[in-house]
Amino acid sequence: MKTNALRDMTNDELLQKLAEIRQALFNLNFQHVTGQLENTAQINKNRKDIARILTILHEREQKTAA
C-alpha cells in the first residue's frame, strides 16, 4: 500500500487496516508452513505495510506530544 494513501486515512482507519493486515500475515505464515503458499513475496509485502502503518501512527503521536 502506498504511504500517501495511508497518510490520508484517520487513526481509526489505520488501526483497522493494521488489524486486517496482521490477520492476513498470520494466514500467509500458516499457509507457508503447510506448503500451500505459492507467492512468498506477499509475506514481506505485508510486513512492510505493517511497518508503514506503525510509523505513521508513531509520527502522529509525536506531533501531538510536542
Curated annotation (Swiss-Prot):
GO biological process, one term: translation
Xref: NCBIfam families: L29
Molecular functions (GO terms): structural constituent of ribosome
Family, per entry: Belongs to the universal ribosomal protein uL29 family.
SUPFAM superfamilies named among the record's database cross-references: Ribosomal protein L29 (L29p)
Protein name: Large ribosomal subunit protein uL29
Gene: rpmC
A GO CC annotation given for this chain: cytosolic large ribosomal subunit
Residues spanning the membrane: none
Alphabetized UniProt keyword annotations: Ribonucleoprotein, Ribosomal protein
